[in-house]
A protein has these predicted regions:
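Short, small-residue-biased leader/transition segments that mark boundaries at the very start
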Residues: 1-5
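Short, structurally constrained coil/turn elements
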Residues: 8, 35, 101-103
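Nucleotide-activated donor-binding/catalytic signature segment of Leloir-type glycosyltransferases, i.e.
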Residues: 10-52
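Short coil/turn segments at secondary-structure boundaries
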Residues: 42-45, 136-139, 155-156
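Catalytic binding pocket for nucleotide-activated donors in carbohydrate/polymer assembly enzymes
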Residues: 52-139, 143-144
Length: 164
């Protein structure tokens, strides 16, 4: 039998903030009722609450099917919360996946939109959490990620020069 995340990490808590497909919202409400005290779902958006979540969380799970830019992962990194994202659009561009051989990365990612790959990314993140040295390094790298216009403008300037 394959061990599920909640069995392997029975002290983990999960907080969901946001909205989406109605079937997923219903699933989260049912899971909240089933796992009282371990899972909480806030369907909708609340700016003040979102900043409390960013500040208090260790990880941000963003399994988006499509995400042209995404700000949540960048805000989370600034707070020191490591994103776990699906490799799409702006999420792929802004989150550097953890490399266990070099120790580099600003979060965790998975390629395909399926539960198996998402679970594997979550398990890798949770294994890193158990190692304070690795976790501290990842948090620092995430907090130091540069999303400024300075970097973007340099890249555009180089592109324009190349085109000339």
């Amino acid at each position: 039998r394959q061990m599920c995340i909640r069995d392997r990490y029975n002290d983990m808590q999960f907080f969901m903030l946001g909205s989406g497909d109605k079937e997923y919202e219903s699933f989260m409400r049912e899971a909240e009722a089933r796992y009282k005290g371990r899972l909480c779902a806030y369907i909708g958006y609340n700016e003040e609450l979102s900043h409390c979540v960013y500040a208090g969380a260790d990880f941000l799970l963003m399994p988006s099917r499509f995400e042209p830019c995404g700000l949540s992962q960048m805000i989370a990194m600034r707070y020191g919360t490591l994103p776990i994202v699906r490799e799409t659009g702006g999420l792929k561009d802004s989150v550097k996946p953890y490399n266990k051989f070099t120790g580099e990365g600003t979060g965790f990612s998975f390629a395909d939109f399926n539960a198996h790959e998402m679970k594997d990314a979550m398990l890798l993140a949770l294994d890193c959490y158990k190692n304070p040295v690795v976790m501290s390094s990842l948090v620092r790298q995430a907090m130091e990620a540069d999303f400024s216009f300075d970097r973007s403008s340099e890249e555009y300037a180089m592109l324009y020069l190349w085109m000339l």
